[in-house]
Swiss-Prot record:
This is Brevinin-1Be. Antibacterial activity against Gram-positive bacterium S.aureus and Gram-negative bacterium E.coli. The lineage of its organism: Eukaryota, Metazoa, Chordata, Craniata, Vertebrata. It comes from Lithobates berlandieri (Rio Grande leopard frog). Pfam families: Antimicrobial_1. Expressed by the skin glands. Its main location: secreted. One of its GO terms (cellular component) is extracellular region. It comes from the Eukaryota. It is found in: Secreted.
Amino acid sequence: FLPAIVGAAAKFLPKIFCVISKKC
C-alpha cells in the first residue's frame, strides 16, 4: 500500500460511514 492510498482511505471512510448511517 502507498501512504497516499492509506491517507485517502482514512479521509473517505468516515465520510462514507457518515452518509450510510445518516449521522452527518
